[in-house]
């Protein structure tokens, strides 16, 4: 543990004082963690993993191993106790695992089959096809949020640099910014950059650039309400803590959860926190699609027509107010399935 923490800190070019300030932990404690004279708590381990970009599973295994050795390492019955504990842990793990509904599992199985087919035809990938689908994604994602530009107008703004008569400057910026944000998440995917607070804030900064420059890439400082929803986002003083928990949840589940469900969960959790004054929906969908791209899937394009938008909002509302995410997970899985089917049909497979 001590070597893992020290090496990770030095690789990040941080001093113990800087780590302490960023995490709100006493500098003396950081030094003790690295010397091995003090063990961090679970919460401190999770925060250190997020800040120092250490794989959470790796550091948690080391932490638990040292915790076990400290408690029973020298006891004559240690091995026997571990064997009994292993069986109990296996049993509890089986009991605690949530069973997916048949409908959701069937869609995930269909997605797996479509992805296998897609992977076998990667050679047919076309820049022009990708460009066209990304254009559609920008159009639909902005349409969900009330942007009135048509698909053709969106194309003219992005690819021809034209100004559309009768459309506001904000609508033009929303189109340009979203397209640049897509390019940004594709770059993150290609570089295999881990998802963390810095990258989420960077995505949001692109979305609001030139629209709300003072709020772009910053958590909100005021309370907000979501029009048409009974869900009340957390108070502004809670946002930073909620976002810490958001990234801890991601690190804890990123290696064990189905990628479609992981992406959908991150989408729902981020938009429920509503950490920004504006641009929460677009940012949440981009984070979701970054996760999908990182796992070899394609962008799940949620349509902005009235029927699709209402289905999307209702599924979110149910997740936020009734603590039932089934409809939302089904909705996102269906969107990815339809996106895969369309992509395969375009390349003629």
Regions picked out by a protein language model, each given a short descriptive name:
Residues 5, 16, 27, 42-45:
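Helix-turn-helix DNA-binding elements, focusing on the entry/boundary residues of the two helices
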Residues 3-22:
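Short basic helix-loop element that most often maps to the first helix and adjoining turn
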Residues 5, 19-20, 30-33, 59:
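Conserved hydrophobic/aromatic packing and binding residues within compact polymer-binding modules
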Residues 43-58:
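DNA major-groove recognition helix of helix-turn-helix/homeodomain DNA-binding modules
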Residues 24-39:
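Recognition helix of helix-turn-helix/homeodomain-like DNA-binding domains
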Residues 66-76, 86-349:
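FIC/Doc superfamily catalytic core
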């Amino acid at each position: 543990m001590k070597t893992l923490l020290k090496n990770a800190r030095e690789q990040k070019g941080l001093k113990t004082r800087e780590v302490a300030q960023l995490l709100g932990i006493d500098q003396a404690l950081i030094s003790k963690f690295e010397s091995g004279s003090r063990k961090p708590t679970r919460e401190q381990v999770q925060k250190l993993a997020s800040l120092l970009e250490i794989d959470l599973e790796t550091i948690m295994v080391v932490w638990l191993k040292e915790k076990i050795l400290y408690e029973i390492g020298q006891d004559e019955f240690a091995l026997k106790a571990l064997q009994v504990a292993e069986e109990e842990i296996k049993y509890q793990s089986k009991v605690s695992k949530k069973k997916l509904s048949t409908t959701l599992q069937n869609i995930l199985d269909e997605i797996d089959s479509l992805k296998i087919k897609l992977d076998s035809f990667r050679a047919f990938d076309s820049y022009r096809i990708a460009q066209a689908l990304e254009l559609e994604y920008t159009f639909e994602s902005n349409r969900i949020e009330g942007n009135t530009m048509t698909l053709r107008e969106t194309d003219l703004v992005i690819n021809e640099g034209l100004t559309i008569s009768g459309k506001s400057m904000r609508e033009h910026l929303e189109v340009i910014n979203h397209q640049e944000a897509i390019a940004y998440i594709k770059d993150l995917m290609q570089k295999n950059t881990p998802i963390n607070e810095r990258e989420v804030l960077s995505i949001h900064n692109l979305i609001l650039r030139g629209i709300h420059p003072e709020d772009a890439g910053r958590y909100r400082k005021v309370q907000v309400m979501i029009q048409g929803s009974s869900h009340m986002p957390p108070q502004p003083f809670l946002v930073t803590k909620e976002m810490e928990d958001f990234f801890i949840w991601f690190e804890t589940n990123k290696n064990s959860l189905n990628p479609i469900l992981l992406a959908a969960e991150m989408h729902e959790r981020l938009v429920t926190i509503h950490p920004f004054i504006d641009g929460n929906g677009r940012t949440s969908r981009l984070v979701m699609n970054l996760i999908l791209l990182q796992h070899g899937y394609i962008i799940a394009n949620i349509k902005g027509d009235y029927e699709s938008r209402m289905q999307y909002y209702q599924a979110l509302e149910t997740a936020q107010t009734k603590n039932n995410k089934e409809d939302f997970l089904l909705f996102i899985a269906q969107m990815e399935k339809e996106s895969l089917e369309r992509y395969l049909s375009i390349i003629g497979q």
